[in-house]
Amino acid sequence: MRNLTFLAALSGLALAATTASASAHAAPVWAGAWGYAPADAGSGDPEQPAGTYRYRVRLTQAGDAMQLSISNAEGDRPLGIAGVTISSPSGPVGTEIGANPVHTIRFSGLQAVALPKGHTVVSAPIIAPFHNAQDVIVSVSFSTPSKPGRTNLGLEMAFAPTTPGATFTPIKVRPYLSLVSVRSSQAPCTVVAFGDSITDGFLGLSPQTRGWPGRLAERLAALPASQRCGVVNMGISGNRVLKQGRATSALDRFWRDVASVPNVTHVILLEGINDIGAGAESGPDAVTPDQLIYGYRQFVARAHALGIKVLGGTLTPALRAGYMSPVKEQTRQAVNAAIRSQKIFDGVVDFDAAVRSPTVPADMKPEFDPGDHLHPNDAGLRAMGDAVNLSLLKP
């Protein structure tokens, strides 16, 4: 009862009646409501001392219970979790904790647990109502030093060491919190946004929108509950389809970052530009359209084996990015033609058409280009989120 009282205040909205009504129509299921794919730290990324990370998380699905996954899948050392808590934020932005009590999370009955290198732990359910678009603060304390990968993404987070008198200061690193799931009687679909830095939200400045998947979640939130999909962002900056770039390749991490998401019904795959850009222009180190198409088909085969539909995203313009060239642009165009052919995926999201310049199709629209000619700015990411045909996400 104490949990219900606390988290009813945390949610800011009593959903008991809504949940009860929905329960009459469908049995509750666990569904992904937020995600952040694990990625390795670089050799130059700094080590953090024992301390606490605070993550501000926006849910994309409502439910009557929550479960957290804390991951060290790409870590370089074993970690010791000293404790995990959930609380309400003090305001519309930032990581300050509000006046409501802090709720302690347990893992198989324990507050403190070991998190070995390469492992993930899942919390016990928190039984209480949560609503769509609700922000919560998840605090993860480590008794050991940690080394998270750095990032330029706008996700709001802060860190404080365990030393006496230490205060929380903003930090830009990849979170150890990898998945938030909710139990819902109305979770008709769950979408995993899968890709590289463009999906990850690199250079995006809107902390809680976090790239085009956040804009997609906003659009879905406006639909009736019976049509509202949760959105889980599993983009990783630098990721590739065929080979390990940053973190495990798309084909290998499918099982970790897609299959493990509860209730996943759809994947929107936007990946391949790093394969093309990092490859050579010719010879054995060049990436050909046929190689990427093969990779896409392998990804789709994995998804279809689990009953998951895959929408293919066309690769966005990048001719003037540092690692591209006219030869590689021809490869991008050939890959996009194959994606648009409707012969690979269950549907297509034409991200390229959403952001390309009408006069120079190999470039982004100037108003969407922050200057690196590769990663769309917030306006461009919003246009990409608007490009998804919501009818393709019907269960």
Model regions and ranges:
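Phosphate-binding active sites in nucleotide-utilizing proteins
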Residues: 208-238, 251-252, 257
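Bacterial N-terminal signal peptides
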Residues: 8-18
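Bacterial N-terminal signal peptides that target proteins for export
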Residues: 1-9
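N-terminal secretory targeting modules
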Residues: 22-194, 203-207, 225
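Oxyanion-hole/transition-state-stabilizing segment in secreted/luminal serine hydrolases
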Residues: 204, 236-291
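Structural recognition of the beta-strand scaffold that forms the well-ordered cores
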Residues: 190-195, 199, 230-235, 265-271, ...
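Catalytic His-Asp segment of secreted/periplasmic serine-dependent ester chemistry enzymes
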Residues: 277, 316-395
